[in-house]
UniProtKB/Swiss-Prot annotation:
Gene that produces this protein: pdxH
Pathway the protein contributes to: Cofactor metabolism; pyridoxal 5'-phosphate salvage; pyridoxal 5'-phosphate from pyridoxamine 5'-phosphate: step 1/1; Cofactor metabolism; pyridoxal 5'-phosphate salvage; pyridoxal 5'-phosphate from pyridoxine 5'-phosphate: step 1/1
UniProt lineage: Bacteria, Bacillati, Actinomycetota, Rubrobacteria, Rubrobacterales
Family note: Belongs to the pyridoxamine 5'-phosphate oxidase family.
Annotated protein name in UniProt: Pyridoxine/pyridoxamine 5'-phosphate oxidase
Role this protein plays: Catalyzes the oxidation of either pyridoxine 5'-phosphate (PNP) or pyridoxamine 5'-phosphate (PMP) into pyridoxal 5'-phosphate (PLP).
Pfam families, per database record: PNP_phzG_C (PF10590), PNPOx_N (PF01243)
Length: 217
């Protein structure tokens, strides 16, 4: 039996004591509240505070999840970029209802987002792709995401071919690569508290605005 399977996990716990989340201290707009917490995560020096778990599902309800990087957010939603041929994209195209999760353990916080994903504009995807390091641009061309690979060497050979192909000129965005924007319908802010009586504030879209409610932990 693996060592980890024999380990007693029942005692792995911690007390949350850092802060609280009260209605009178939270912004009535969830995007502004997210921006406030995101800035605090940046100031705290968290490793990749823009990392978020993206959950998708097939039309028949088979879920899958992976970590992607947030590359922008505003009142329209949360943006990430990916290969349009990979599993996550295929599932989004068939079933655009998705969920996001930000976990900032050092701050004893998490943010959950539920909404609908749609592609960003060609212009927006082009503008972001142009900011990527050249190696990442070439990597986007080299990867046939989620398809089987014969070997690591196969990928390295493809990358070398692309380096020769685009030598001395800008790397354009591949037509099979771009962004998605998740338009939020529900955003929940969770703050760990003592005795597991955590603070949970849920914002639900209601007409042109948002309705906020406190949830029991």
């Amino acid at each position: 039996m693996p060592e980890g399977a024999r380990r007693d996990l029942a005692g792995l716990r911690r007390e949350y004591t850092r802060a609280g989340l009260a209605e009178d201290g939270a912004d009535p707009d969830p995007i502004r509240q997210f921006g406030r917490w995101f800035e605090e995560a940046l100031r705290a020096g968290l490793y990749e505070p823009n990392a978020m778990v993206l959950a998708t599902a097939t039309p028949d309800g088979r879920p899958s999840a992976r970590t992607v990087l947030l590359k922008g957010f505003d009142e329209r939603g949360f943006v990430f970029y990916t290969n349009y041929g990979g599993r996550k994209s295929r599932e989004i195209e068939a079933n655009p209802r998705v969920a996001l999760l930000f976990y900032w353990g050092e701050l004893e916080r998490q943010v959950r987002v539920e909404g609908t994903a749609g592609r960003t504009s060609e212009e927006e995807s082009d503008a972001y792709f142009a900011t990527r390091p050249r190696g990442s641009q070439l990597g986007a061309w080299a990867s046939r995401q989620s398809e089987p690979a014969e070997s690591r060497e196969e990928l390295e050979r493809r990358l070398a071919e692309l380096e020769r192909r685009f030598e001395g000129r800008p790397v354009p965005r591949p037509p099979f690569w771009g962004g998605y924007r998740v338009r939020p319908e529900r955003i929940e802010f969770w703050q760990g508290r003592e005795n597991r009586l955590h603070d949970r504030l849920l914002y639900a879209r209601e007409g042109p605005g948002w309705r906020r409610v406190r949830l029991q932990p």
